[in-house]
Amino acid sequence: MVKSMAANIEIEAKVLIKKEEYETFLKHFKDKITEQYEQTNYYIDTKDFKLKQLGIGLRIRNVKDSYTLTLKAPMSEGLLEKDQIIDKKTSDEAIENNIFPEGNIKEFVKMLGINVDELKVLANLKTLRTEIDDGNSETKLSADKNDYNGITDYELELEGNALEKTKASLKEICSECGIEYKDNPHSKQSRAMSTIK
């Protein structure tokens, strides 16, 4: 069942960090942690990665018994993100039986010339997300511990409304914690998908 759909532009700066840096970061911001929760992403594409070739990401995310189908497409700055809220039954059918959810995202994928019957979950990634109040109402800071295909990595993300400004803010935050800032252009999806044999 389709519940609703929304579109927005996602602009974020990200940096992959070591486990020790992750622990240092959480210690530094321990009094500013606002929420911590688990989320699981199920990444969808065709066996021959037709969506990836177009620069498009597609996933189902489960957070606290809430399920969202998301399509991300590149823009000149940031990503166009289309979200479609789905129920658990629809999510399970997509993940377990490759039955793609009805709705605008399905229609968009079909317009790209992709047969939705070829789409299936190829990888999944579980994240322990810690959200931090960084004192800036224009940004959203989080620290993620990600587990996928036997790999664990750690990442800082800062969402904002202008890419260069957001990167500069994240560099400042990293510097404050003694973390070397190295821009991470690889999304969680590309990292998880790169482990597929």
Please provide the spans of the model-predicted regions.
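Phosphate-end processing signature that detects enzymes handling 5′-triphosphorylated RNA
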Residues: 1-197
